[in-house]
Amino acid sequence: MFPPSSAPLLLPQLEELVVPLHTAFTLTCQGEATIAWDVPLDVPEKTQEDNSGLFVTTISVDSASAMHTGYYRCFYRRNATEDADEAMQSIYVYVPDPDVPFVPLVVPFGNHVLSDHEEMEIQCRVSDPSANVTLINVDTQQPVPCMYDSKRGALGVFTAGTYVCKGVVNGAEHYSEDYIVHGWIGGSGLHVELTAKHTVLLVGDTITVNCLAQGSEILEDHWKYPGKVANRAIKTVHENKKDQEILYTLTVPQASVKDTGIYSCSITDVVTNMSQTKQIAIRVYASEFMSIQPKFGEYESAELDEVCEFRAEITSFPTASVTWFKDSVPLSNVTAEISTSLQKLSETSYMSVLTLIRAKEEDSGNYTMRVKNGDQSRTVSLILEVKVPAVIVDLMDIHHGSATGQSVVCITRGQPTPLVEWFVCKNIKHCANDTSSWVPLPVNSTEVTMDSRFDEDNNLETQVIFGHLENTLAVRCLARNEMAAVSREIKLVSNGPHPELTVAAAVLVLLVIVIISLIVLVVIWKQKPRYEIRWRVIESVSPDGHEYIYVDPMQLPYDSRWEFPRDRLVLGRILGSGAFGKVVEGTAYGLSRSQPVMKVAVKMLKPTARSSEKQALMSELKIMTHLGPHLNIVNLLGACTKSGPIYIITEYCFYGDLVNYLHKNRESFLNPKPEKSNKKELDIFGINPADESSRSYVILSFESKGDYMDMKQADNTQYVPMLEISNASKYSDLQGSNYDHPPSQKGSNDGEMDQLLSDNMSEGLTTNDLLSFTYQVAKGMEFLASKNCVHRDLAARNVLLSQGKIVKICDFGLARDIMHDNNYVSKGSTFLPVKWMAPESIFDNLYTTLSDVWSYGILLWEIFSLGGTPYPGMIVDSSFYNKIKSGYRMSKPEHAPQDVYDMMMKCWNSEPEKRPSFLGLSDTIASLLPSSYKRHYERVNHEFLKSDHPAVTRVCVDNDDAYIGITYKNQGKLKDRESGFDEQRLSSDSGYIIPLPDLDPISDEEYGKRNRHSSQTSEESAIETGSSSSTFAKREGETLEDITLLDEMCLDCSDLVEDSFL
């Protein structure tokens, strides 16, 4: 057989071949010997020998892909080591794939290129020979000059960095994977460090092991660890080119006991073929553990000024916290000369050291080391005794010259407690030089008694009591312990009579007692609380509003239109009384055209009120006239300031204060009753729509009896005489008022309003009711803020509830016994509601609208805790103040939605400027209520301001038709007759009693007698007042027209007001 030629024959005989994607192609190589192939991807080959002796090898690809792109070479197997150019035949096959424009690399680290500053190859080969390829530097995003060969890639000299090839095929841009050119190959060797964040862990913790390698940039890492079979670890790589190091991190989440073992990291330098392995032990415990080995005994002693150390070894995981106590007080609060330290011996072992730098006597005591580890806590204790030499603090004669004997007290101290011995010397002249003259004192003889005790400073007081002394003698006190022995002497003079000293002492004692008594009386008088109105009008004196002054209420004008004839006011039962005054239920006649008889609340001072308190009440009246009317404040209706005590007449709120209401309805809130299917629909004020045309905007007087407010309740048997109205003319039978509103046209959402603002209190209490209360209070406070008025005592006890579930803000401090009210804390000569006050009010005496916002947040807490006391279980002391300063805030009440609690927390912001305004608060609450609530509220408020409510008419009317009482022009009287007022009669057998100034309440029994003899009482009262010309004593047959005429006659009498308070 002839020797084969130098190279076989490859068919087809082309340099390159383009094969469409997913089509088949075949290459054939024939020669005179056995043939081998070098192909980019393994493909099946078929070899056969024909009759002529030629070897024919065929490779076939059924579905071509981009991975088949590359050189296909055939050669004689025996010539594999010969020159490639002569021994091989080759063809380059392209398989264009639009989804794979660049041929993927199959060689490990094929995208890593070593920079040797010679021509390099970045093998970003394309699958489509028509592609236009540009090399881009990723770091600069700039093209890199190079020569590109579609069969080899980008050719050139490249600096270290990251590169990418951009190919454009048919107008579309494609990018290859990143190619990394390494500029450093590493030092002379390979260095590996293996560390772990924690080598001891608990089940569930995360194991983190770091393997830091320094060598070339082409390194391989290989890990061995207990959980490798389960492939539990996560590996990450971070390259630090600046320091020429690579960090490999192995992370095992949710470690278990099975992850305990050896963790091994092996690093191989691909360039130098060097490798290095490091190991570390990791231990995972199933649970926490802790043990203490004290290096001291239960009892220890130290000498004075000695440096002492007491050690205890602690084994714990996780890390334990160690605290030392002395006599149950943390050592950090005892002295700076006692130090504690904690030394870490290993990840689970520590040494705690207690050091007494210079032991002192007060360092004696019980020392306790408490070690806490999670839920585990253990303690070890030692009792330390610092030995102190015995000393005599004092030696004194207490009863020198007493006729009943003399007493000598020797005060000693030392550790251990000194032993005290007594000696006497009767020969005074030789006591100093002759030790034999001193003899021990017999214990508890007939002439001498001894006693000893420890005083508050833990000193030992030893007392010797001598009977009658005939001669002067010297007494020695000797104190000794194991550290020292000391003695002191004192001379006792024999007993003798000294009557002049006795008399002088008695006079001196009496004088001291008198002086002390006077001082106590003065202090008590100065500390007696004085009445002051909490509401204040402020005026800003700085551009930013941070500085302000209080406007003196006495400088505000008083409009005499508010004056109401005293004889038109009948006082009834006492609603509440306090340290300064009282609030009395009253009936006013002629306040309004639509309600000629109206139940009101009357504020007055006690008869013993000082002039400053009268001035304060007048200030309150002027502030209320300054504010004007609003739906959600207790409005001023009138005042009596002339010819008698000052009376402030306000709206009467039947359901009392909000706290009591929430308490009484707590059960209905917690256990709501099922709705009755046949319940009548009510409008938002609880008025039957069928009767709406005959009812006023809001009923201001009631015949039934209810609690009024949470204050010191007066004796129920005490009454101020009040007009009796017969059963035939009760309030419920009176005709409708003249400020009726037209019947409402109810929509589909009014059912929600029925429950929110219904007057049917049996319906129960809902979360929407609570939101309604908070919204109305916010609107009321928004109104006060618009008037520059600061409330300073905003709380649920100062919010009253009237018909239709309308809440009204008030200040009933006058009639509240604040000296015995736990909500008020004594500070100087006043009592403050500290738990409702903002920090700047408590600590800086700063009151603004923003401090009222803080109080509003406390009010929200009260409402949604259903009348709970703020900061439950906490007393107002230094600890309370410190907690407020440090940012303590109350947790969310049980019934508060999260949105409401978020609003509370905003109100309690320690920085006042960051608290919300009352306008913002009302908008926020409105968003939590049914959509139609705000519309209903605005309609009611509009009707209130358009009505002839007394609080509105006195502000709006400034013409001749204004009325005081019922003072109408003739056309007004005609109009009253036409509307049926002349049909309203008072009972013929009911007397009208003119109230005496500051008349003491009467008992129920006396009140009943007066009712039975009303006519007689009326006459007597009229005589006592001395005002027969203005007495409104209604006779049988009198009509309201007659009452009106009397009013007009008396109108001129009401122009004078006490000038001293105006």
From Swiss-Prot:
Present in an inactive conformation in the absence of bound ligand. Binding of pdgfa and/or pdgfb leads to dimerization and activation by autophosphorylation on tyrosine residues. GO terms for cellular component: plasma membrane; receptor complex. Pfam families: I-set, ig, Ig_PDGFR_d4, PK_Tyr_Ser-Thr. The keyword Disulfide bond applies. One of its GO terms (molecular function) is platelet-derived growth factor binding. It is an enzyme of class 2 (transferase). The modification Phosphotyrosine is found at residues 548, 550, 697, 708, 719, 731, 739, 824, 963, 992. Its EC number is 2.7.10.1. Disulfide bonds join 29-74, 124-165, 211-265, 410-477. Residues 569-945 form the Protein kinase domain. The active site is at 793 (proton acceptor). Residues 734-754, 975-1034 are annotated as: Disordered. ATP binds at residues 575-583, 603. Residues 28-504 are extracellular. It catalyses: L-tyrosyl-[protein] + ATP = O-phospho-L-tyrosyl-[protein] + ADP + H(+). Residues 1-27 form the signal peptide. It is found in: Cell membrane. Residues 28-96, 91-184, 190-281, 287-381, 389-493 form the Ig-like C2-type domain. Tyrosine-protein kinase that acts as a cell-surface receptor for pdgfa, pdgfb and pdgfc and plays an essential role in the regulation of embryonic development, cell proliferation, survival and chemotaxis. Depending on the context, promotes or inhibits cell proliferation and cell migration. Plays an important role in the differentiation of bone marrow-derived mesenchymal stem cells. Required for normal skeleton development. Required for normal development of the gastrointestinal tract. Plays a role in cell migration and chemotaxis in wound healing. Interacts with homodimeric pdgfa, pdgfb and pdgfc, and with heterodimers formed by pdgfa and pdgfb. monomer in the absence of bound ligand. Interaction with dimeric pdgfa, pdgfb and/or pdgfc leads to receptor dimerization, where both pdgfra homodimers and heterodimers with pdgfrb are observed. This is Platelet-derived growth factor receptor alpha.
